[in-house]
Amino acid sequence: MSKSLQAIRGMNDILPEQTPAWRYLERTFAGLLDGYGYSEIRLPILEFTELFARGIGEGTDVVDKEMYTFLDRNGESLTMRPEGTAGCVRAVLEHGLSGGGQVQKLWYTGPMFRYEKPQKGRYRQFHQIGVEVFNLPGPDIDAELIILTWRLWQKLGMADAVTLQLNTLGSSEARARYREALVAYLQERFEQLDEDSQRRMTTNPLRILDSKVESTQALLVGAPTLHDYLDEESIAHFEGLKARLDAVGLRYEINQKLVRGLDYYCRTAFEWVTDKLGAQGTVCGGGRYDGLVSQFGGKPTPGVGFAMGVERLVLLLETLDVIPAELNRPADLYVCAFGEPAELAALALAEQLRSSIPGIRLLVNAGAGSFKSQFKKADKSGARYALILGEDEVANRVVGFKPLRDEGEQQSIAWDALPEHLAACLAQA
């Protein structure tokens, strides 16, 4: 027996009952970004593999273990994007968007792909909304991005469910000095490290700070801290960021072990986390990447950005029960028509109502059927009113107008009076 067709593990369908919450989140954030002066950019899903190897970094879990990579028919190595920043930087460089110090404030949304173990809140195809800013080096733009996300949580009704964790990774020189000290400390305790952390000792030792293994975290209690190796400029940048967050009353926690999972970050690093989703508690993360553009062959260009996971945010909205009820509102009107003349009249009336009453949710019966079957479908649809058209109604240019959710009587309404009558009924609800 052939295997039934189904979605690939970790790549999920987003069903009709789920999409209203997705659209609500995306629409809310798009409106917020527009108000802050950010422009949308749309990026390809496929990029040359080299882009991510150079940008994210060899030795990272993303590059070494998680990328979907293949050779195309020309022998080119292509990768389905595991994140959005590298592709956005590539687009900015390719199209000269940051030339001459021009400030770019961009956002994008779409699917990303990583070969990870699927679990609640973590999938192999997942969706992100990302924001990237170029040619602004100061802490003021870092603060703006964090405040922007804070405002989104407020709009969505989840501000009390998330916590901001903040850190500075310093300059590349400061990180190099700290890396040397951390490696020396951990080398003496190498055999006590978990296997993954032992591997990271030679590839990306700073990522050991982010280990979820309790025994490794216990070893790190006495480890040197990055803040002891910071340069004065990075300290000033971090103090400037904190001062701006303090000025607007945005609370945060300093987490010196927050290093983010990608190699390109420097100075500011931040995450918004929640304790409502179990192990997958990070719903948004980002930071500064001043060296990434030059790493791709461009001129040194300050950059900062963040990405948020749409699946996790939707899950958090559901967990907190803050999805507006009107997102799943039923139809306002269901049109029943009996006979071809009535079906034609119903179609014309429906379009007239859609033009007259913006935002109306109107269903026209499809597939004919008896009066009983059409009325049954009208009731099942959840519509508030039914519109009834038969031969007599068409001949007299009237409709039967029947409430379905209260005890009101059916009325006969002239076609010309219908838009005004229906609008008045909808306004009363």
From Swiss-Prot:
<dbReference type="InterPro" id="IPR033656">
    <property type="entry name" value="HisRS_anticodon"/>
</dbReference>
<dbReference type="InterPro" id="IPR041715">
    <property type="entry name" value="HisRS-like_core"/>
</dbReference>
<keyword id="KW-0648">Protein biosynthesis</keyword>
<dbReference type="InterPro" id="IPR015807">
    <property type="entry name" value="His-tRNA-ligase"/>
</dbReference>
<keyword id="KW-0436">Ligase</keyword>
<dbReference type="Pfam" id="PF13393">
    <property type="entry name" value="tRNA-synt_His"/>
</dbReference>
<dbReference type="InterPro" id="IPR006195">
    <property type="entry name" value="aa-tRNA-synth_II"/>
</dbReference>
<dbReference type="GO" id="GO:0004821">
    <property type="term" value="F:histidine-tRNA ligase activity"/>
</dbReference>
<dbReference type="InterPro" id="IPR045864">
    <property type="entry name" value="aa-tRNA-synth_II/BPL/LPL"/>
</dbReference>
<keyword id="KW-0030">Aminoacyl-tRNA synthetase</keyword>
<dbReference type="GO" id="GO:0005524">
    <property type="term" value="F:ATP binding"/>
</dbReference>
<protein>
    <recommendedName>
        <fullName>Histidine--tRNA ligase</fullName>
        <ecNumber>6.1.1.21</ecNumber>
    </recommendedName>
</protein>
<keyword id="KW-0963">Cytoplasm</keyword>
<dbReference type="InterPro" id="IPR004154">
    <property type="entry name" value="Anticodon-bd"/>
</dbReference>
<dbReference type="InterPro" id="IPR036621">
    <property type="entry name" value="Anticodon-bd_dom_sf"/>
</dbReference>
<comment type="similarity">
    <text>Belongs to the class-II aminoacyl-tRNA synthetase family.</text>
</comment>
<dbReference type="Pfam" id="PF03129">
    <property type="entry name" value="HGTP_anticodon"/>
</dbReference>
<comment type="subunit">
    <text>Homodimer.</text>
</comment>
<keyword id="KW-0547">Nucleotide-binding</keyword>
<keyword id="KW-0067">ATP-binding</keyword>
<dbReference type="GO" id="GO:0006427">
    <property type="term" value="P:histidyl-tRNA aminoacylation"/>
</dbReference>
<dbReference type="GO" id="GO:0005737">
    <property type="term" value="C:cytoplasm"/>
</dbReference>
<dbReference type="InterPro" id="IPR004516">
    <property type="entry name" value="HisRS/HisZ"/>
</dbReference>
